Amino acid sequence: LRNNQDQLRSESYQGLMDHLAVQDVPQDQQHAVSRRVILPSSFAGTPRSMQLNYQDAMAIVRKFDKPDLFITFTCNPRWPEIVENLPPRVVSSDKPELVTRVFNLKLQDLMRDITEHHIFGRVEAFVYVVEFQKRGLPHAHILLILQEMYKPKVAEDVDQLIRTEIPDPDTERELYDIVVTNMMHGPYGVLNPVCSCMVDGKCQKDFPKPFNSKTQFRSAGGYPAYRRRDNGRAALVRNRELFNDSVVPYNPYLLLKYNAHINVEVCSTVKSVIYL
């Protein structure tokens, strides 16, 4: 505690008292405000904590250059480790401690694959955060900065890491099932106007994506236009047919190993840091 007073100190919130004076709060009621404490940056989730984490991430980017890959890893409540340990008539949302523990172990394994087994190449630096969705499922946002020789610089490099097409069910049946279950966006649009992504009649995630015969880097920055061939291959999702223009970018190895929603994107700017 003695060595971390800058992070742990509290101070009187005089600004609040000044605000009350401006708002003409009666003097006899102002004393009830008493002393206010500013939560320290060590208190996770507070504005000071989020600002500090953002500044730390930007410091890493300044030293090691912009991120190369942005990965979103979401917990799958149907993982056997969760389902097999649920008591009778209990669902995963009733056991957040079980879900969180399993997800944390999977996340540690994923980070070992990335940083020790070098599935994307050798990593120069990385940063990640873990968040909880409204329905209680944890997910992690991971930024990777690769060593220079492993950075995806041309379309062929991107195609080796990322797919945005429905696999062939005859030759890659297991991968096909995982993609259809976890990596299809929708149904949305006219197929499902009440989808959560729909605002003013338009998908906020910009689906459907345009078909492309080859991957192209965009001069304006952001994510590349991935290869999405219009080969007619379809997947049935909630009784609706979806095509390659509705596939969320993924890495086949990670999907086969972790059987979860794992969105893998190539970064072109530092804007992805704001998602942390």
Task: Name each model-derived stretch.
Residues L1-Y275:
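Extended, structured polyanion-binding interfaces
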